[in-house]
Amino acid sequence: MRRFIPKRRILLFSDRLSLRFGRSRGKVVTQSIRMLLGSPALEVVARIVLCFPFWGSGLAKLIDFQGGVAEMAFFGLQPAVLFNIATIITQLSGSALIILNRATWLGAGALGIFTALTIPLVHHFWKLEGERAIVAFHTSTEHIGMIGALIIVAILSERRRRLG
């Protein structure tokens, strides 16, 4: 004869909050999080933070133009001056479009393609050995994650535009 074993209830995070702080406290926490996530100010901050690797790099290459040219030459990108100019334009204009939420799809697309191209051009871990290969591999995987984030920001921007 089989013994009946009751199924355990899986507690969601919100259920655990309710048990710990009482029902009303859980609702307050949930409402606070919803308010925060719906905040236009937080959205702008998130866009600025998301684009920081791009606008930070673009500004650094603009401020220290010769350093940017040297970086391009180091990675074998010739003519280094033109690659530096193209990088600055792509990084700063793509970031601006995303941060300002204007043609976000274009800014995210430009930065996504730019980021994808850096993998075979600069972070080609399959051609390297030892520690350099490991660093390039991890950089490449981080770049793939960034590309995913850029796709998400474009999707969310388009949804918001459609909803008005």
Describe the role of every protein-language-model region:
Residues 2-63, 81-164:
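Extended, low-polarity transmembrane helix blocks
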Residues 65-78:
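Short juxtamembrane and helix-loop transition motifs at transmembrane-helix boundaries
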